[in-house]
A protein has these predicted regions:
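Transmembrane alpha-helix/helix-exit interface in multi-pass inner-membrane proteins
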Residues: 105-125
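Short juxtamembrane and helix-loop transition motifs at transmembrane-helix boundaries
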Residues: 14-24, 132-143, 165-174
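Cytosolic juxtamembrane helix and N-cap/initiation of the first transmembrane helix
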Residues: 77-108
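Core segments of alpha-helical transmembrane spans in multipass integral membrane proteins
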Residues: 1-16, 31-32, 104, 140-165
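Membrane-interface interhelical connector segments
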Residues: 119-138
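Membrane-helix boundary connector in multi-pass membrane proteins
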Residues: 38-55
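Hydrophobic alpha-helical membrane segments
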Residues: 25-41, 175-176
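Membrane-water interface at the C-terminal end of transmembrane alpha helices
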Residues: 43, 61-80
Length: 176
């Protein structure tokens, strides 16, 4: 919920500030939503409650992609994209090391959660959950839950990588 709330806030920023130059928010969200759509379909199981997310996630993804393409013409959402140059563009070395560490950990977490959610669940070693544990909400998450969290975390990882690669200047919507 918290990860999705952050994406909601980024969308509210676009609505409040205007879409000019907000490719730095929208492209990572699109990538995360595409991965989420794939993981929802790949890992959906019999224990997952409703079939609705299997259809809503891809529909939401298509709507978000359509909004991006509509904003390209109207509000110059791609403003600044052509000036994006990859490189390590943070001058403060301790900050650069910290951000690189966050990016590496984010890539690892996202990759493991999306590609091998079952292994991530087994890594906690919960074993078999008793009915009392399940009633208390202490059971293991489903594979789709772990994979979706990895796809949401991917958005934040890409945002952080963009700050490292392009520098922090003008990235206040991403950093907040």
């Amino acid at each position: 919920g918290v990860l999705m709330f952050g994406i909601f806030l980024s969308t509210m920023l676009i609505l409040n500030e205007g879409a000019k130059g907000m490719w730095k928010i929208m492209i990572p969200v699109i990538l995360g939503f595409v991965v989420m759509s794939a993981t929802v379909w790949a890992y959906w199981g019999d224990l997952d409650s409703s079939e609705t997310p299997k259809y809503i996630v891809p529909i939401t993804t298509v709507i978000y992609i359509a909004a991006y393409f509509l904003l390209r013409a109207e509000d110059e959402v791609d403003d600044g994209l052509s000036e994006f140059r990859m490189g390590l563009n943070i001058e403060d070395k301790p900050s650069l090391v910290a951000m690189l560490l966050v990016v590496v950990m984010g890539i690892w977490y996202s990759f493991m959660s999306v590609v091998m959610p079952g292994d991530r669940i087994e890594a906690f070693g919960l074993g078999e959950a008793s009915p009392e544990m399940l009633d208390a909400g202490l059971g293991a998450p489903s594979e789709v839950t772990v994979a979706v969290s990895g796809s949401l975390f991917l958005v934040y990882t890409i945002w952080t990588a963009m700050v490292v690669l392009d520098g922090p200047k003008g990235k206040w919507p991403v950093l907040h």
